Amino acid sequence: METDSGIPGHSFVLKWTKNIFSRTLRASNCVPRHVGFIMDGNRRFARKKEMDVKEGHEAGFVSMSRILELCYEAGVDTATVFAFSIENFKRSSREVESLMTLARERIRQITERGELACKYGVRIKIIGDLSLLDKSLLEDVRVAVETTKNNKRATLNICFPYTGREEILHAMKETIVQHKKGAAIDESTLESHLYTAGVPPLDLLIRTSGVSRLSDFLIWQASSKGVRIELLDCLWPEFGPIRMAWILLKFSFHKSFLNKEYRLEEGDYDEETNGDPIDLKEKKLN
């Protein structure tokens, strides 16, 4: 995990560098609009550091907060985090209870005044099969959603409890119930009933812990053309802003290259026109 150094002024330099980096990325207009995170490795991190599993999950929350701050400062519109899989209910009752308690505390925290939602104008959406949550937690979810519903700058989708298969099943049921008899149904119809409907399409998916699978997360969205997937060999609590900044930078360069390539296909590229397509017949030769 990236930690502050004891060098005088280190925190100030890091903050200053992050601000410059974020402004540069925003100005490039090549930032991913929607980033998804599979935050894997909290339990292994706890074992590695010989700490309680709950402490591992708490370390993961700290990492998530730092990563999301960088994303929103850099201009990312939507972040979707895989907080709790429906499959996780199969874990020990002690761990499930601990995760639910932690979720309740953190949902309250990120919606408090001065915290993530307030600081960056983030609208909180809890997506998944909410019928699996107890009444007290559902009330915290309702308050978080209600408190942030008028925030327009960015969105945070918290998948809790969630699986991609359940999301698709939910979308199919909603389509059947709401669609008029005899009307055509296509991919866009189904997409309009996904939990992520109304936010930009997924651009970038990041998974930690060195595992090469999606683990039933955003499986419909990740299948779209152009989605970049980053599989990292570090555990989630070890994933920090510096590595995230590098990923955003790579994405920006890649998108910039594709945009330039597209313009070259549509028309000649000219530095005098900032790369806009030009008509050779109208261009005067010196």
Swiss-Prot record:
One of its GO terms (molecular function) is prenyltransferase activity. Belongs to the UPP synthase family. Pathway: Protein modification; protein glycosylation. Present with 8970 molecules/cell in log phase SD medium. It comes from the Eukaryota. It is a peripheral membrane protein. One of its GO terms (biological process) is dolichol biosynthetic process. It is an enzyme of class 2 (transferase). This is Dehydrodolichyl diphosphate synthase complex subunit RER2.
